[in-house]
Curated annotation (Swiss-Prot):
Pfam families: Linocin_M18 (PF04454). Keywords: Encapsulin nanocompartment, Flavoprotein, FMN, Hydrolase, Ion transport, Iron, Iron storage, Iron transport, Protease, Transport. GO terms for biological process: intracellular iron ion homeostasis; iron ion transport; proteolysis. This is Type 1 encapsulin shell protein. InterPro entries: ENCAP, Encapsulin_nc. One of its GO terms (cellular component) is encapsulin nanocompartment. Proteolysis activated by calcium and cobalt. Gene3D superfamilies: 3.30.2400.30, hypothetical protein PF0899 domain. It comes from Thermotoga maritima (strain ATCC 43589 / DSM 3109 / JCM 10099 / NBRC 100826 / MSB8). Shell component of a type 1 encapsulin nanocompartment. Assembles into proteinaceous shells 23-24 nm in diameter with 2-2.5 nm thick walls. Cargo protein Flp (ferritin-like protein, probably stores iron) is targeted to the interior via its C-terminal extension; empty intact shells can be isolated in the absence of cargo protein. Fe(2+) may be able to pass though the 5-fold and dimer channels in the protein shell. Protease that exhibits activity toward chymotrypsin and trypsin substrates. Probably does not have antibacterial activity. It is found in: Encapsulin nanocompartment. Residues 184-189 are annotated as: Pore-forming loop. GO terms for molecular function: peptidase activity. The keyword Iron applies. The lineage of its organism: Bacteria, Thermotogati, Thermotogota, Thermotogae, Thermotogales.
Amino acid sequence: MEFLKRSFAPLTEKQWQEIDNRAREIFKTQLYGRKFVDVEGPYGWEYAAHPLGEVEVLSDENEVVKWGLRKSLPLIELRATFTLDLWELDNLERGKPNVDLSSLEETVRKVAEFEDEVIFRGCEKSGVKGLLSFEERKIECGSTPKDLLEAIVRALSIFSKDGIEGPYTLVINTDRWINFLKEEAGHYPLEKRVEECLRGGKIITTPRIEDALVVSERGGDFKLILGQDLSIGYEDREKDAVRLFITETFTFQVVNPEALILLKF
């Protein structure tokens, strides 16, 4: 991956390892979409578009030679720069266990938020429809734990009618889930009751959405396609600091909208 130019950076192997490990730790907790969608790839930096398996016919009916264009989703290329203090990084070699990587950490969070934004809300300029775009798959839900359980049962009933198998996952706004937990009554925890309704699925809380959705995790319905997975490269040196960047190429495809139900509170 020469485009990352890591060998040109004034950083030691230990420093690179610390940077990569810290970024990986944050990505693991902040990439909410990857917790329940299928991840394909990575196919490499040169992978520019993902084929959709269709042809848009553009020739006239009376033409002898018919022709068209293969449909595809172009990959989104993101790049976010940040700077780290070289003296502080050298402290790592001196034995300091907690060097300041706050600039890296903040950039990682913004990149994770961008990827999730595409998954949940789409990106019109790149032809991506996000999960929340399918308003026709919406059901209303009240504000009590009982209302939530009833909405999940209704969602699973719709899945059953459409032939969508499980397991199923509830993706819900973190604050809304906390409020449901505050209002629960009885000796049997709400979390257990929801998990039983989901038939072996799980609950994912996230600040990325305002309401909730129930999705099937049978596989093949929602695809995050990676060209170059999240990587860190070297950009330049600025006196006593080093300028690095995070990059990724990806797109997202909702193959089957019938595998999701939006819950609106």
